[in-house]
Each structure stands twice: as C-alpha cells, then as structure tokens.
Amino acid sequence: MEIRKLSLSTIRSIITSLSVLVLVISASATLVRSTPPNVLEQVLASGELRVISTNGATTFYEGSDGLTGFEYSLLKGFADSLGVNLAIENQADTRELLHAVEQRQYHMGSAELTALESQDYHLSFAKPYMQITQQLVYNHRLGTPTSIKDLKGKEVLILADSAHSKRVARLQKKFPNLTWRPIENGQMIDLLEMVHKGEADYAVIDSNAYELHRYSYPRAKLAFDISNPQPLAWAFPHSKDTSLFDAAQRYMAQIKRDGSLAQVTKHFFERHIDEVTTGEAMVFAYRLQNRFPQWSDAMKSAATEFDLDWQMLAAIGYQESHWLADAESHTGVRGLMMLTKRTARAMGVNNREDPLQSIYGGAKYFRMMLDRLPERIQGDDRLNLALAAYNQGAGHLEDARVLTQRMGGNPDKWEDVRKYMPLLSKSQYYSRAKHGYMRGWEPVQFVDNVRNYHKIIAWHEQQNELRLASYSGGALSSLHKAPTETAAQGENLSL
C-alpha cells in the first residue's frame, strides 16, 4: 500500500484543528459543570429541608413523642413528600425570621405568616393553608360589645409589632377615641389569659389562637371579628428559581384535594366539648389543679400496670367521685372510683375508701371490661362500650348490644348502641332482656361525660406542654436549632 507523505503545513493544520476541537469540548464540559443545581435539587441532594419558624402552640413544639404542632405537621408532610428530613430552627422575632428567609439563609419560613406583616420584605407566598381573622375577646363579666364603637374609652390589649398593630393603626384613624395597649414580647395565649383572669377587659387575638385555647380560658368570650380573613402561607425568598416554591404549591394543592389538610386542621383546632357548661368547665379546671395532683401518681402508675390511658382513668375517677376518696352514692357504691362491694371484692379491694386500692381496683375493672369485648371491636367504639360496661356492668351492656342488633343496628358501634340502650328502662324491652331493667340513659350520659372530661384533661396537659415549649423556646438563644427528623417522631402528614 502506498502511504502518501503529508506536507508540514498540512500536519500543522490538522494539529491546529484538533486543538480547537479539544478546547470546544473542554469549554462545553466546563459550561455544563458550572450550571448550578436549582433549589429543589439542592434540597434533594442535601437530604434536608431547612425551615425557620417560631416555637409556639400553633407552629411547632416539643411534645411527649417529639416535635409536633399544626404547622410542623404540614412541614413534615412536605419534607416527606420530597423524601428528605425536616430541620426547623426557632426564631421568636418575626422581623428577623422574615429577613432570614429573604436573605436565603433558609429554604422557607413558616410561622403563621401573612402578606400584611410581610409586605416590607421581598418574599413569595405559597397557596394559603388557613384563613384567620383578628377577633375581639372580652371578659365574661362585661356586656357583649357588638361593634368597635362600643369600645370608646376602653383599653384593648394587642400584641406589639404584629399584624394587629397595623390593623389598629388604621382603626385609630377612623376611631381616634380608642385606646390600644401593646404588649411587648407576649403571645396570644398571654392576652387570652389576662382577659380570662380579669386583668384586662378586652384583647385582640387571632381566630386560630382563640379556637385552640378557648376551653382553657372560658371567661374570655368572643365578641366579633375586627378584620377581613387573612391567608396564612409559607414564605419563600423571591427568586427566578421557583423549583422549591412550585413543589410546595403542588403539595399544598394535593393535601387540599385529598382532605389531608382538613384532617390535620381538625386534629389540632376542633376541640368540641359538648354539654360542658362554662361553669362546669371552670370548676373542673380548678379541681384539676387543686384536687387531682394528690392522685396523679397513683393514676399514672395504675394506668401503666393495666395498659390504660391515665387521662381516661382520671376522667372516670372524676365522673365517679369528683376525685373525693370518701365519696358515697345512694346506691351503696363508694370510694374514689365508686366500686360496688361485689366489684371491689372481685378486684381484690379490701377497703373501698382507701384511695390507692380504689384507683387500682378501678383500673383493673376497666381493663377487664375492655378485654371482655370481641377483638373485632376497636378504637373509640371499644373504649365507649367498655365505659358503658364499667358504669352498668357487662351483662347490661350485652343486653343493649342484643337489643341493638334486634332493632337493626350494629352492636359493635357505640353510636348505634347508645341509641337503643335507653329503651332498656322500658318494660316492653327489658322484659325480654337477660339481665332485666337498667337505667338505660345513665351509661349514655356517663360515657359522654367521661369522654368530655378526658378531652379537658388531655387539653390541659397539652396546654402545659405548649406553655413549657413556648417559654423554654424564649429562654433559649433567639435562634435555636431543633432536632431534625432522624429521631423525632411527631405528627406525620405523609403523602
């Protein structure tokens, strides 16, 4: 084969072309490498969503099982949807929080933020997760105000440096005779407590805060809204890179569509306590603080031994005796848990007026009532049916379940059983029952009352946790990093 010789100029031309090609390829590679990942890609790569928030009742706090709270649950759900951990840092000062988000020190901010209080910052807000209004509350001993004009010459508390102060500034121009007293470094719960105790006549608080704390402060009554609904939403740094913002928008749309948002909102804010009047709630709250503590350790110990909820056991004790060790009824039951002679003997209780024996006997008996129910009955139905049995005996409960089935209801569902149980006080029904007559309305009321007292006890317990969380948060440095989700197990909203 003949090999043609290349001229020197041709060789130089080829070398030059190859050099140019190498430079082009190198430049292209450098260009590709120099394109930074977007914010969402950065979050996914780091495995962590960094959020700045404010430690408090409606945002996040340390519960018995780790971090929890309304906004925490939403944030945890968002982080889970991305497959990353959630890291929350606490910042008590809203202005500092907004500034930190604006400066991209965090991926996002979540602390009951409204556009009104954030208008001085360059931020983008996602779809709102809640609408709130600013509401006037008043002490119950006063007449109910019906409009702003009724507050002429009165002093109204507000939180300093909040959306309220901006709203008040506008109201003062329209109503110059109003007197507003700003409270520095306070929280909604502080204003509500001051009104409840009579230390203040009026205050302006957010509607979600009122809903959350209303049963703890029954003397603070709701008057009217003083603002239009304001949307609460997550805040993001304003940027052309909307990757994480868009992901949040999709997540918020999803949880609204599938009902998850409504579910978590109900869990944290809807605390319906039916048939407990304001007076009864106040008496109960007083006794919870002044009478119950002496039995608290025994209740918790007995509940642990018999695998019960101590708050439920305490609620039973209150319904039975108002936590009085020497209580006695006209039917002969006595003691803190109001045991009959036969029940006390079966539970190994020698002295029904011995509060420790009574508590342990009551706990053992309630556990027995729970265990006697068919395994297929679970959840609230199991609890409620066991409570009815505790009150009237397992035999009467079985009669009620048989009657319920005969009447076309479901004997495993408390809502059906409670409907037919009162019929067993009528001869046409109890004459056919194995265990005869029963005061059929009593177990229904018993269950309702116990469940209501249980809600109040659980609510007060949560309030203690919230208050500890709030003030422990304030005692920390102004910017305190909370644990990440590697260990914390809070309210989970996974999609």
UniProtKB/Swiss-Prot annotation:
Chain segments carrying region LT domain: 274-495
Family: In the N-terminal section; belongs to the bacterial solute-binding protein 3 family.
InterPro entries assigned to the protein according to its UniProt record, in alphabetical order: Lysozyme-like_dom_sf, MltF, Solute-binding_3/MltF_N, Transglyc_AS, Transglycosylase_SLT_dom_1
Descriptive protein name: Membrane-bound lytic murein transglycosylase F
Keywords: Cell outer membrane, Cell wall biogenesis/degradation, Lyase, Membrane, Signal
Job description of the protein: Murein-degrading enzyme that degrades murein glycan strands and insoluble, high-molecular weight murein sacculi, with the concomitant formation of a 1,6-anhydromuramoyl product. Lytic transglycosylases (LTs) play an integral role in the metabolism of the peptidoglycan (PG) sacculus. Their lytic action creates space within the PG sacculus to allow for its expansion as well as for the insertion of various structures such as secretion systems and flagella.
Residue positions of the active site: 320
Signal peptide: 1-29
Gene Ontology cellular component list: cell outer membrane
Main subcellular location: membrane
Highest taxon listed in the record's lineage: Bacteria
Subcellular localization(s) per the UniProt record: Cell outer membrane
